[in-house]
Amino acid sequence: MTTKNMNTPPGSTQENEIDLLRLVGELWDHRKFIISVTALFTLIAVAYSLLSTPIYQADTLVQVEQKQGNAILSGLSDMIPNSSPESAPEIQLLQSRMILGKTIAELNLRDIVEQKYFPIVGRGWARLTKEKPGELAISWMHIPQLNGQDQQLTLTVGENGHYTLEGEGFTVNGMVGQRLEKDGVALTIADIKAKPGTQFVLSQRTELEAINALQGTFTVSERSKESGMLELTMTGDDPQLITRILNSIANNYLQQNIARQAAQDSQSLEFLQRQLPEVRSELDQAEEKLNVYRQQRDSVDLNLEAKAVLEQIVNVDNQLNELTFREAEISQLYKKDHPTYRALLEKRQTLEQERKRLNKRVSAMPSTQQEVLRLSRDVEAGRAVYLQLLNRQQELSISKSSAIGNVRIIDPAVTQPQPVKPKKALNVVLGFILGLFISVGAVLARAMLRRGVEAPEQLEEHGISVYATIPMSEWLDKRTRLRKKNLFSNQQRHRTKNIPFLAVDNPADSAVEAVRALRTSLHFAMMETENNILMITGATPDSGKTFVSSTLAAVIAQSDQKVLFIDADLRRGYSHNLFTVSNEHGLSEYLAGKDELNKVIQHFGKGGFDVITRGQVPPNPSELLMRDRMRQLLEWANDHYDLVIVDTPPMLAVSDAAVVGRSVGTSLLVARFGLNTAKEVSLSMQRLEQAGVNIKGAILNGVIKRASTAYSYGYNYYGYSYSEKE
């Protein structure tokens, strides 16, 4: 038994280091793939940077000043701190449909005119070749919807100001300066600056679509917190257009602010004009009451103390009135726990206490003085209110006639000379990094997913003797390989027809040399066997068993030995294609009793050995192999040939190898480098041993010299020359 220990021993202490070296080796092995993918992504990034439409950015600066309060309340500025300008509502106003809608109407932004280029790369190529874009000036355009959908028109420039307009179901000719109408479409072209044959695509979107598009490229932000300085920015591919749009938005915002301020002043002025007669009437009544009382009391005048108290009371009342007006404004902006609101309430409480103190002093005066004081206070308070209203009326009249609002444009719109997109250097760097990341990730993922045997030590760790490691023949691989199944698979597909025979067509190949080494090993391995029949099978399909067995037959035949090659793979055997011999009469016909030996044995002249091909595919391959004729064939061959090589199907696919193996003296199992796992090889050999087959060991076929494998297992030559560990 060669599979003495099927359990994998514990990993060495250098396992992590080996894994790291293996991954580094994988990157080195696939360096061409990594370089190619990275270069591809970098070139894509370069092409994108060169061909994509440059995007420019324009900006303008607008200042929102603190709104001026009522002139009556100006005396409170020392008591109540000024609040910062409210920028958030102004930002929302700038982005509103009211402001943007006016700009869209002014600049006809509903109309879309685009020159027609070759898809994807046409515009960028025209820009790289310095081709001047055409210009189309439209003074009026109306394109109705068609079946509820926006329709596009194609305008083709002609000679001498003529053009052709194509739409859904119509084609009409027009001329610059003349109105064109067709099927509801109305168009007036003011000017055309383009070569004949140039095409433009015309379309018209709704106002809401235009506003949404504008909002997508227009941003407003406050330059610094509570500064009132608003920065308006816009991006687009037309630097002149975005400048005009920004200036229009800023001007429309300024005009609406002025109009709003004028409307407020007008309403306040109307209110004052209604209130002034009433206040004047109340003042006249108060003065008349005071005069009547004095006449009744023989012109009673206030003493000095009463006059002083009167002035104080009137002053306190005026301040309380101002606080009442101010509270009405503050309550709309702040809650009662706000510092500004609390300062106002504290001031009111102080004034209320002062008024109570003054009222106590008045209560101590004679009744006549108290009445005169009360009437005088009414007159003074009414006169103060009346004068304040008169002053405010004059201020509002002046403000209305010269309204400037609380907004001003600091910096008109300017477009930066260099585009903000694409960022060419950044795109190229990102493309390089992305390509490197994807290629390295794919290589490492493939390495992680790969579980195939890559070194003889992996099999020997499972107690499996490795008789030879046969390198991949690049010469043969180039002539037979089709393609991989996918990126993450190691399995190669090869042709099974019109393929060269390596042992004859390129006998100096390293793979043939490795088979010669196998011939030497087999000479000693088969010295004590019961017969000279060698069975070669594989763990799974595509392991290369036919290549190994056929090459071994040729190599042994070259040493002047009589060799018979039997293709016992009755399902997928293709040795007849390899040897270019007939497959009409083969093993299946002999086992079925249709043909005799002299009819199925053919001589392969180039290889120097005899061949029994597969024959026609039978419906019952396993049953045929179990017949006595198969045993009789092997006994006859053992007597008439120096060596008989039997190529059987893969062990894990079908049980044919176990059937044939009981009649042979020596068996070898072929494992494909990177394809078959150690577990598959162990399981195959276990099944053969359970069937009573004398399985000597394994052959590692298709070995590829890799840096990753060399780092992990440290062998330097295929099959029989391992580096010594110091």
Swiss-Prot record:
Q: Which Gene3D superfamilies match?
A: P-loop containing nucleotide triphosphate hydrolases
Q: Which residues lie on this side of the membrane: Cytoplasmic?
A: 1-32, 446-726
Question: One Gene Ontology cellular component annotation?
Answer: plasma membrane
Q: Which GO terms describe its molecular function?
A: ATP binding; protein tyrosine kinase activity
- Report if keyword Transferase is assigned: yes
Describe the reaction catalysed, as an equation. Answer: L-tyrosyl-[protein] + ATP = O-phospho-L-tyrosyl-[protein] + ADP + H(+)
Q: What EC identifiers does the entry list?
A: 2.7.10.-
| Membrane topology, record value | Multi-pass membrane protein
Q: Fetch the SUPFAM superfamilies from UniProt.
A: P-loop containing nucleoside triphosphate hydrolases
Record topological domains on the Periplasmic side: 54-424
What does the entry's PTM section describe?
Answer: Autophosphorylated. Dephosphorylated by etp.
Its annotated compartments are:
Cell inner membrane
Regions crossing the membrane: 33-53, 425-445
Pfam families, sorted: AAA_31 (PF13614), GNVR (PF13807), WZC_N (PF23607), Wzz (PF02706)
InterPro entries assigned to the protein according to its UniProt record, in alphabetical order: AAA_dom (IPR025669), Bact_polysacc_biosynth/exp (IPR050445), GNVR (IPR032807), LPS_length_determ_N_term (IPR003856), P-loop_NTPase (IPR027417), Wzc-like_C (IPR005702)
Alphabetical UniProt keywords:
ATP-binding, Cell inner membrane, Cell membrane, Kinase, Membrane, Nucleotide-binding, Phosphoprotein, Transferase, Transmembrane, Transmembrane helix, Tyrosine-protein kinase
Check the record and name the PANTHER family matching this protein: TYROSINE-PROTEIN KINASE (PTHR32309), TYROSINE-PROTEIN KINASE ETK-RELATED (PTHR32309:SF32)
Instruction: Family membership, please give it.
Output: Belongs to the etk/wzc family.
Q: What is this protein called?
A: Tyrosine-protein kinase etk
- The species this protein belongs to is Escherichia coli O127:H6 (strain E2348/69 / EPEC)
